[in-house]
Amino acid sequence: MPTIQQLIRRGRTTKASKTASPALEKCPQKRGVCTRVYTTTPKKPNSALRKVARVRLSNKIEVTAYIPGEGHNLQEHSIVLIRGGRVKDLPGVRYHIVRGSLDTSGVADRRQGRSKYGAKRPKGAAAK
């Protein structure tokens, strides 16, 4: 416990909070170019082939980003939009690709949670 005199001399230091997505540089999203699109396997209790992409952002930082949803049209040199958000069972994947923006298509035949996957409202949707 500091004395009042020590506080006058030095003051209290505020602890700087560490960001979970440093490559975004405090931006909500960043644009980037896919340098490699591949699948990888998740951590221990889970088993799958998760679709990920290595992306070089507009600020020259290279990150690994997850491609959400079923099926995608991404390949090398595709322009993508990156948002924050890690994938718990993929170590080192701290970003998500935004579906339905730039070169990334929305998920086809998606009916629920469409806005998260860039899917348009289906034509035969009944009026509520």
Swiss-Prot record:
A GO MF label: structural constituent of ribosome
* 3-methylthioaspartic acid found at: 89
Output a single Gene Ontology CC term carried by this record: small ribosomal subunit
GO annotations under biological process?
translation
Where along the chain is composition biased (Basic residues)?
A: 113-128
Q: Which InterPro entries match?
A: NA-bd_OB-fold (IPR012340), Ribosomal_uS12 (IPR006032), Ribosomal_uS12_bac (IPR005679)
Alphabetized SUPFAM superfamilies for the sequence: Nucleic acid-binding proteins (SSF50249)
Q: Which PROSITE patterns match?
A: RIBOSOMAL_S12
CDD domains membership: Ribosomal_S12
Annotated region Disordered: the residues are 101-128
The lineage's top-level taxon is: Bacteria
List the keywords (alphabetical).
Answer: Methylation, Ribonucleoprotein, Ribosomal protein, RNA-binding, rRNA-binding, tRNA-binding
Family, per entry: Belongs to the universal ribosomal protein uS12 family.
Instruction: Give a short account of what the protein does.
Output: With S4 and S5 plays an important role in translational accuracy. Interacts with and stabilizes bases of the 16S rRNA that are involved in tRNA selection in the A site and with the mRNA backbone. Located at the interface of the 30S and 50S subunits, it traverses the body of the 30S subunit contacting proteins on the other side and probably holding the rRNA structure together. The combined cluster of proteins S8, S12 and S17 appears to hold together the shoulder and platform of the 30S subunit.
Oligomeric and partner information:
Part of the 30S ribosomal subunit. Contacts proteins S8 and S17. May interact with IF1 in the 30S initiation complex.
User: What HAMAP family has UniProt attached to this entry?
Assistant: Ribosomal_uS12_B
Give the protein name, as stated in the record.
Small ribosomal subunit protein uS12
What is the native source organism of this protein?
A: Prosthecochloris aestuarii (strain DSM 271 / SK 413)
- The gene designation is rpsL
